[in-house]
C-alpha cells in the first residue's frame, strides 16, 4: 500500500495525504487534500480496481475546484448531477495526461460491473433516468440506448472542459429531466381522459 500511496502522490503532483479505511468507495477531500481508499476483502479489491480508484481520485486532486460543493450549492444544483459530469471530465483529463491509465479505467470498471458495484445486475439499464445512464455510459456501459434529444447531453458530458461548463450542463440536464417527467405525467392524465 505504501507504493500505491507514493504513486498517488506522484500522479497528483503534490504531497496529498493518502489514507486507507473500511468504507464502500474511494474519495478525495479537496480541502483536506486527502485521498481515501477503501479496505475491502482481498478478493474484492483487485489491483485493477485499486488502480482505477487511485487514477479517478487523483483526477479530482488535479482538476476539481476546492469549492465545488459550495459553488453547486449556491446555484442550487443537485450534487449528484455535478459529480457525475465532473467525474466524466476529470477521468478524460487523467486519460489524456497519463495514457497508461486508459487500460486501468477499462479493466477496473469492467471488474466493478462484474461485481455489481453499481447495482445494475438483472436490471434494464436503458430504463434508468438520463443522468444515471450518462454515469454508466462513462463508466464503460456503451451498449445503452439514448433518444436523439438525450444524445446531445451525453456528448456534451464527454466534452466539458471547465467546472463552469459542468455546472451549466448539470442545470440543463436537471431541467430537461424535469420537463420530460412532466410530459410523461401529462400524457398519463391525457390517456385516462
Task: Name each region found by the language model.
Residues 1-193:
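Short, functionally important secondary-structure microenvironments
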Amino acid at each position: 500500500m505504501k507504493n500505491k500511496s507514493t504513486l498517488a502522490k506522484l500522479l497528483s503532483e503534490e504531497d496529498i495525504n493518502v489514507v486507507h479505511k473500511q468504507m464502500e468507495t474511494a474519495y478525495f477531500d479537496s480541502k483536506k487534500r486527502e485521498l481515501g481508499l477503501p479496505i475491502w476483502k482481498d478478493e474484492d479489491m483487485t489491483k485493477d480496481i485499486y488502480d482505477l480508484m487511485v487514477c479517478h481520485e487523483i483526477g479530482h486532486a488535479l482538476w476539481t475546484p476546492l469549492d465545488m460543493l459550495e459553488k453547486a450549492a449556491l446555484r442550487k444544483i443537485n450534487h449528484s448531477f455535478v459529480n457525475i459530469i465532473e467525474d466524466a471530465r476529470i477521468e478524460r483529463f487523467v486519460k489524456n495526461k497519463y495514457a497508461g491509465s486508459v487500460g486501468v479505467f477499462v479493466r477496473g470498471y469492467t471488474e466493478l460491473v462484474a461485481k455489481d458495484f453499481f447495482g445494475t445486475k438483472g436490471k434494464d439499464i436503458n430504463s434508468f433516468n438520463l443522468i444515471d445512464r450518462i454515469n454508466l455510459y462513462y463508466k464503460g456501459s456503451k451498449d445503452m440506448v439514448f433518444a436523439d434529444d438525450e444524445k446531445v447531453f451525453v456528448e456534451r458530458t464527454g466534452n466539458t472542459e471547465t467546472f463552469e461548463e459542468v455546472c451549466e450542463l448539470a442545470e440543463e440536464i436537471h431541467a430537461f429531466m424535469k420537463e420530460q417527467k412532466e410530459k410523461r405525467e401529462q400524457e398519463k392524465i391525457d390517456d385516462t381522459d
